[in-house]
Design a protein with these regions (language model features):
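A generic "binding-loop/recognition-motif" signal
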Residues: 56-57, 75, 91-92, 101, ...
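A short hydrophobic beta-strand segment most commonly corresponding to one strand
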Residues: 42, 60, 86, 101-113
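Short beta-strand His + acidic residue motifs that chelate non-heme Fe in jelly-roll/DSBH
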Residues: 50-52, 70-71, 87, 93-100
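Conserved short histidine dyad/triad with adjacent acidic residue
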Residues: 24, 39-55, 89
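Short, charged/polar surface micro-motifs in flexible loops or helix N-caps
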Residues: 32-35, 45-48, 67, 111-113
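Short, conserved beta-strand element in jelly-roll/cupin
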Residues: 41-45, 55-70
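Short acidic-glycine-tyrosine-enriched beta hairpin
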Residues: 75-89
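A short, N-terminal "cap"/entry segment at the start of jelly-roll beta-barrel domains
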Residues: 1-36
Length: 113
C-alpha cells in the first residue's frame, strides 16, 4: 500500500509552476501508477490562471476549494467545490481564479502521454 500526504517530502519535491499560474505537486505519478498518468494538486492564487493549453491526454479537474472560471474549447463555466470538469484529449483548456481565495484543484490525467 502506498499512501501519500500533500506535505510528504516525495510530494513537495515535485513542486512546479503549471502553465504559468498554479503551484502544483505530483501526489502520485507514473513512477507508481500503471493505468493512470498522474494525480496532482494545484493551487491558484486569486487572479492567477492556468493558461490555455492543449494536452495529449484526457484530464479531470476537480475543485476542492475556492472557485474559478473553467474554459474547455469554446465553453466557459463557473466552477466551485465539488465540481469535476472532464477535458478531452486535444481540447484547449484554462482555469482562472476569479474569486478572492485560493482555488485548489485535483488533476487526474490519463496515461496517454
Amino acid at each position: 500500500m502506498i499512501v501519500r500526504h500533500v506535505n510528504d517530502k516525495e510530494v513537495l519535491d515535485t513542486t512546479y509552476l503549471a502553465h504559468g499560474g498554479a503551484i502544483a505537486q505530483m501526489i502520485l505519478d507514473r513512477r507508481i501508477l500503471k493505468e493512470i498518468g498522474f494525480l496532482a494538486i494545484a493551487r491558484l492564487a486569486p487572479g492567477k490562471e492556468i493558461e490555455g493549453h492543449i494536452d495529449p491526454m484526457e484530464e479531470i479537474y476537480f475543485v476542492l476549494s475556492g472557485s474559478g472560471e473553467m474554459r474547455v474549447d469554446d465553453e466557459t463555466r463557473q466552477v466551485g467545490p465539488g465540481d469535476a470538469t472532464w477535458i478531452p484529449v486535444g481540447s484547449l483548456h484554462a482555469l482562472k481564479n476569479n474569486g478572492d481565495e485560493d482555488c485548489v484543484i485535483l488533476v487526474v490525467a490519463s496515461s496517454n502521454w
